[in-house]
Amino acid sequence: MVFRSSAAICGAAITLAVSVVMARSEIDRGHSNAVAKAASGAAIVGAASMYNPYRPGWQEGGPNTASGERYDPSAWAAAIQTSLRGKFGGVRYGASPKYALVEAAGKKAIVKINDVGPLTPGRIIDFNERTMRHFDPGLRLGVVYGVKVTPLSGDDWTPGPSDRRRGRVP
């Protein structure tokens, strides 16, 4: 009887130790597992930051996007996390950009996903300057948390602060 209870305690201790090690490894990978799990559903939720290769700083990405378009700070556009590029139409050179509905802070905007790779760890999306000003008008926050990004099917969306699809309201 003592042997069985000792074995049970030992088994529980080993299970706990393995769980702690696995949790630490997930944290060390920068939330990649959490993002991958969220990507299996229709929408992903996480944090957003801003990028602009024309502003000084270490986060310069260059004037061209992954789709081959030139970066335009006045467009309603964003860069999706590299590991999620398949969910958002591939985002590759020469391909038509895809669109997403972005919701945060009680606001919504349709953005063109034409680039990849938020350079800041832990972010799921990087907004260009115009999109970030929609969610953070004074650019004071730097990061917008609780951003919900839903891929939109089709390519007839009009980017901007609305839910309209070329005259049709979904």
What are these regions (language model features)?
Residues 1-3:
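N-terminal secretory signal peptides that target proteins for export/translocation
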Residues 5-10, 14, 18-170:
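Secreted/periplasmic proteins
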